[in-house]
Amino acid sequence: MGNPFVHVELMSNDIGQAKTFYQSLFDWKLNDVPFGEMTYTTIGVGEGTGGGMMKNPVPGTPSAWMAYAAVDDVKAATAKAKSLGGAVMKDVTEVPGMGWFSVITDPTGAMLGLWETKKA
């Protein structure tokens, strides 16, 4: 399997301003969804890869977009990234009913999310 980008996510320091900006710029359909103790905003784009927005979980860091690549086994891919000189920023975490993700950095410091969809 190739590993396509399957999701993009904005971690914003001002989620209200970001929502107004992107909805006005692209006419995206935004939907706020309660997710544990936070609200996650899904981005509907029609065709193409959708995504989401959330409050930046790391205070003091700039707002940034992050892409997620599909993998067959997120635990194995995370371990492989580490063995190749990458670092694990967020270990494998379950998204109930949907799948699992981790966040890695490559040896240059660039972040990438890894996503494994739950099999039916």
Predicted regions and their residues:
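Core segments of cupin and vicinal oxygen chelate
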Residues: 2-5, 9-48, 83, 95
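Vicinal oxygen chelate
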Residues: 3-6, 10, 31-34, 78-120
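Helix N-cap motif at beta-to-alpha junctions
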Residues: 14-15, 72-75
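Short amphipathic alpha-helices within nucleic acid-binding modules
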Residues: 21, 75-80
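Short beta-strand micro-motifs in enzyme catalytic cores
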Residues: 39-41, 65, 98-102
